[in-house]
Amino acid sequence: VRRGCRHLLLLARRQPAAEEAALLEDLRQQGCTVRLALADVSDSSALRHAVDSALKDMPPLKRIWHLAGTLDDDRLLRLDASRFKRVLAPKAEGAWNLHRLSLDHQLEAFVLFSSTASFLGPMGMGNYAAANAFLDELALYRRHLGLPALSINWGAFRDAGMAARQADLRTLSRLGIH
């Protein structure tokens, strides 16, 4: 908001918790129009419907920031297809669906929140590493097409997101991800 954002469309699978709702209200108090649309980014038709509906009374879409993700860590031989899909769906499928949706818009930015796991390949996080490697490659693909793209390889966030749980932080720390 301090840098000029006046309209924000947030996609989420669920309603915000109290602390998150307070942050959204703070943005509104600063003069930002905040619209929350419930949709799973891995469901392309639900995603398109949510975005198209929201944009009917909003300015054109200019930037996409993809932050979705989840963890389901285990050794590769213990991961079945459903556990792999659980991690790939929000990150990889969601990113691809956002990419396809973005082709209908003149974007200034397409930002993907990836992880250092994509190139460190930590033990027990093969599905998560693969999902994040997809984000990195999607950014390269978009750049090859002349489209905006940036993939940021984050470490663990201590106070928010998937790794905020102490058990996850300890696991990531043992793997050298800080």
Regions found by a protein language model. Give the residues of each.
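4′-phosphopantetheine-dependent carrier domains
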Residues: V1-H178
